[in-house]
Amino acid sequence: MMSFVQSGTWFLLTLLHPTLILAQQSNVDELGCSHLGQSYESRDVWKPEPCQICVCDSGSVLCDDIICDEEPLDCPNPEIPFGECCAICPQPSTPAPVLPDGHGPQGPKGDPGPPGIPGRNGDPGLPGQPGLPGPPGSPGICESCPTGGQNYSPQFDSYDVKSGVGGMGGYPGPAGPPGPPGPPGSSGHPGSPGSPGYQGPPGEPGQAGPAGPPGPPGALGPAGPAGKDGESGRPGRPGERGLPGPPGIKGPAGMPGFPGMKGHRGFDGRNGEKGETGAPGLKGENGLPGDNGAPGPMGPRGAPGERGRPGLPGAAGARGNDGARGSDGQPGPPGPPGTAGFPGSPGAKGEVGPAGSPGSNGSPGQRGEPGPQGHAGAQGPPGPPGNNGSPGGKGEMGPAGIPGAPGLIGARGPPGPAGTNGIPGTRGPSGEPGKNGAKGEPGARGERGEAGSPGIPGPKGEDGKDGSPGEPGANGLPGAAGERGPSGFRGPAGPNGIPGEKGPPGERGGPGPAGPRGVAGEPGRDGTPGGPGIRGMPGSPGGPGNDGKPGPPGSQGESGRPGPPGPSGPRGQPGVMGFPGPKGNDGAPGKNGERGGPGGPGLPGPAGKNGETGPQGPPGPTGPAGDKGDSGPPGPQGLQGIPGTGGPPGENGKPGEPGPKGEVGAPGAPGGKGDSGAPGERGPPGTAGIPGARGGAGPPGPEGGKGPAGPPGPPGASGSPGLQGMPGERGGPGSPGPKGEKGEPGGAGADGVPGKDGPRGPAGPIGPPGPAGQPGDKGEGGSPGLPGIAGPRGGPGERGEHGPPGPAGFPGAPGQNGEPGAKGERGAPGEKGEGGPPGPAGPTGSSGPAGPPGPQGVKGERGSPGGPGTAGFPGGRGLPGPPGNNGNPGPPGPSGAPGKDGPPGPAGNSGSPGNPGIAGPKGDAGQPGEKGPPGAQGPPGSPGPLGIAGLTGARGLAGPPGMPGPRGSPGPQGIKGESGKPGASGHNGERGPPGPQGLPGQPGTAGEPGRDGNPGSDGQPGRDGSPGGKGDRGENGSPGAPGAPGHPGPPGPVGPSGKSGDRGETGPAGPSGAPGPAGARGAPGPQGPRGDKGETGERGSNGIKGHRGFPGNPGPPGSPGAAGHQGAIGSPGPAGPRGPVGPHGPPGKDGTSGHPGPIGPPGPRGNRGERGSEGSPGHPGQPGPPGPPGAPGPCCGGGAAAIAGVGGEKSGGFSPYYGDDPMDFKINTEEIMSSLKSVNGQIESLISPDGSRKNPARNCRDLKFCHPELKSGEYWVDPNQGCKMDAIKVFCNMETGETCINASPMTVPRKHWWTDSGAEKKHVWFGESMNGGFQFSYGPPDLPEDVVDVQLAFLRLLSSRASQNITYHCKNSIAYMDQASGNVKKSLKLMGSNEGEFKAEGNSKFTYTVLEDGCTKHTGEWSKTVFEYQTRKAMRLPIIDIAPYDIGGPDQEFGVDIGPVCFL
């Protein structure tokens, strides 16, 4: 590979081995160049010396060194030809062959023609399919190179070569068009082979001569070099069917193609004799197809070739004659069910079959007479949970949501097809030469330019040595079909091949003969009950409908059962020969055929017309292996193969030299989430951090201990009783007291704040069916209701008649929770009793466990009309309609489209109890549902047995001071402590009241006689006395008064889990609680029994739009589309992953700004968008003029039904239910107030979220403001305030309001991570450079990383400060201060989320602080250093990578604890 490099990447030249490296560059004028005293024109190419090549490009000289390949040549004596740079292998010469038809051998090449003028750039082609890998080129020629060979690029051929010495043989030019063939000459003597002439530059193509008469067939020449891939031609007409040839030799393995459809099996081709390989030439342009040659003699049969890859499907051949009927095959697998046939005539009566399993429920019988009023049934067992309903229809488009936060960069898509070339920009000035670049990967081969004008013929060079034989060229395009050859002898049968892949299904065969009677199957499961009515005769088939729009791609279906084998299709045309596939397993050997008697050779008769293909004869004996046949013509290029499996991973390369620090790149795409690391050992307590911000006023602390005693004062008057004594040790827990009696019920308390969601209340009893009302005004779309608990399955009732509309009730308060019923066993289905009047509703059973979504049930029969819907709020008065003609009231019209759900109606009156339904069969156990919300607190269990005392745990950190506890019972008298040192003198207290008379003291020792003085005032207290000796232990005093509660002790060690206590007895039912708010939606129950088929319901309204799904996996690459119009230049794509740092190049000159390119043509029109959301209702219009009086309505209108009828949706024309009677319903203020209260509570939770999963806060600071009473702990936050489903769980420090997010994982395991390559030490990034390393990620591991990244981005925007700690565990590794040198040169670097680096010294904004430094020397023991970084730029955190310096030795290990990142 060799490339010219220029500042603006001018062009790329592709060679086979060598690499050109930019050496020098000089400028003259715009047209010509001057170099070393010689003048050259633009686009001239010359070699000043053998290993240098130069080109003149519009006044600029580009010279490059030719670097020879370092790989040794595979020949004993490589040679460097004169005037060349690199060594090549000498080629043996071969004598010219004497051809059998008397023609002389091919003469030497003619003199090279003059070079052509440079062609203009061709239009960019469409991107081609990847070609087959080409054969390796022959080594080039090079002088003064150590080993390896090279030739410079053939694309230099368009430049004028000026050199003092004639060049060696170049590559052959493109083939000219065939000239007119001359008359055949007389056979000459075979001439001796001439020496090859100098290879000239390619000549200018001559004009195409008229086609001459076909010459005699020439002998098969040696295989020419592989031609250049031409553009795909149009498919030719299928040629006549050729004779089966012997198998060809195995070709080189091509690039695996996409698997084609299996074609019809082609005929074997003949083996060609491998010709001598000529020197590899350039790929020539496709020549015109030659005339058909005469058919050659058929070669002997070759050895069977390896199985080829499946070829393209050939065109279907003409249908062959019907073969003789074969013996009956094995019965095929059962086919798919056919369409229903017409009813057959009744068969003969069969024998009595075995008793079948019980059938499914029959269709409902005639409606029975109403039975007598039944008693209320006992509470039924809870029915099994029902299936999830089938998904609702698509809802109408909701209003457009708030634009979401920008998503993260998606996974990189597969490369699109190459776009068309953009308009070239203006040429910039040449840059200064850069340093040598590293050897690049081979570039794609450029398109062939047009032939240049002929150059001046060069002097004839010396004879070159023959090159080594090249690899076989790629297959050429198939030649035109030759004339049909005579029929060959039938070859012996080959061994059976391995079974082929399953072919495409054949055409549908005629009905086969009836198979034998199958074994009786097991009784099937109960079918779903059929709809009523007898089956009608099948209607005549309808015409085909219009093609529907293509639906969305379905999910991958399960593999279908194999269909019955179809009859053999007609024999297709032979397909093109596929590439040889991998060798298959040996098939079973075929049976030897009978040996035929030898026939005498007959005279060749005239060729008869092609007879029809006869039936296949018996296989003949295996013949001897034939000689290798001539090479067949190269076949067409096959389809690209399936991509091969990845090779084994290579060994790790040597570490590169450290490059200079590159500029900070754009943030890379987030790395994949690493596995959770093993939890690290618990570190010792860290040192005290820097003082935090001043907190708010804390809660009142516990009562302080009593201070030390002051020095003895002067004797006072008798004091009052002394202060309370010091608290004694805390007494042990008392035994539990007897259970107190039940207290009187207290008065109702004031309304509390809304509680957490309680369990779902039972559904109210179903009211009696009301008459169907007119459609009400279309209400605002309510939120989807909660699914009701599946009741037991009732028998299908008769369809009731439409009753008159009942009045609408208001929403009832949710009922109390019913006690869960015991689960009954499944009873045998009883006969259907006569319908009694409905009994009272039994209590609702507890909801079943959540099941997986059941399959969609069969549609049930049309149900009887439901009860009246709840009345919507009265709509605005509509405009008066136009006057209608007086008509008789028509029959009731069909039901209108269902209106949107109104607000929940009140509970109806209790209906009379229905008969308890038969318990349905138990459904399959569902998958465990999602974890539900915490249940209500159960009754306390009886105390479990005392557990064994656990081992003492490590002492925990002291918790915050608790609230003062209740006063403890008096402890026993403590042992008298030693006397304390006298305290400093206290202030004189106020004089106390006189105390009771004390006991007389013992007489003191006599003092020294003082001088008589005047009575003085009280003196200052004396100095501290010396401490007295320890007194004897006094007797136990009487118990003191209860002491003040002591400070809370440190938390005791956690005891082991106690054994599970016995289940407590069920407590008495508590008083009914106040109705709780509606519970959260229960998880779907397991699948219920399949319902009866209902009549087709009317089309429902569209459901609400679902949440946006997570991005799916990338689909398979589509087929390339047609080239689009040239689009405008796109915006720069996202930065790729950070590459290795390249060598530091010299700065180039500043280029001038180019002219702005033209604006591209407008893109194609986009697809039609989805239907927009329904607009908000417009402002009410002005009232219209009053209409004329309507016709008199029918009797008995008005009431709630009249209101419901007003403004009915799309009511056509006059409605008899319009009226102006006053509204006749009572407003239940209590229910309205309770509804308002519930709505108020929900709004309150939106305004002041409590940090639960249901009501996440924006961040912990908001939570602290709204709820100052909350303690520090884990809460849910949703910084982007979008859907609650992406809320994240964080730790809230309620002292400061910080929001802290843990890393995931939180530790890097302690181990040997890096081995030094011996170069000088440097910082090594853990996530970027170390094997198994990873960049740190944050947030819950079960959330997608891009969701956490979005939340972090919003959290940064909401914060003004951020901080984070990192603990580095070291073993023989310096983390910060090097104790030996006393400096911080070996300190770690940390990388923030914006790829900024934090260091030990430098700019104070980017330096970290060290809280504890235990990694200052190599001790062979584990220690740790704790780093902290605080910033007012929240964008810099969290820390995503760490780069130690002092690592790489065999005994150097480290690990990391990643502390949580906290935002404030």
Curated annotation (Swiss-Prot):
Residues 170-1195 are annotated as: Triple-helical region. The keyword Iron does not apply. InterPro entries: Collagen, Collagen_superfamily, Fib_collagen_C, VWF_dom. SUPFAM superfamilies: FnI-like domain. GO terms for molecular function: extracellular matrix structural constituent; integrin binding; metal ion binding; platelet-derived growth factor binding; protease binding; SMAD binding. It is found in: Secreted, Extracellular space, Extracellular matrix. Residues 31-90 form the VWFC domain. Residues 147-156 have a biased composition (Polar residues). Ca(2+) binds at residues 1278, 1280-1281, 1283, 1286. Residues 100-109, 186-198, 310-321, 354-379, 399-412, 606-615, 678-691, 717-727, 907-934, 945-960, 1068-1084, 1120-1132 have a biased composition (Low complexity). This is Collagen alpha-1(III) chain. It comes from Mus musculus.
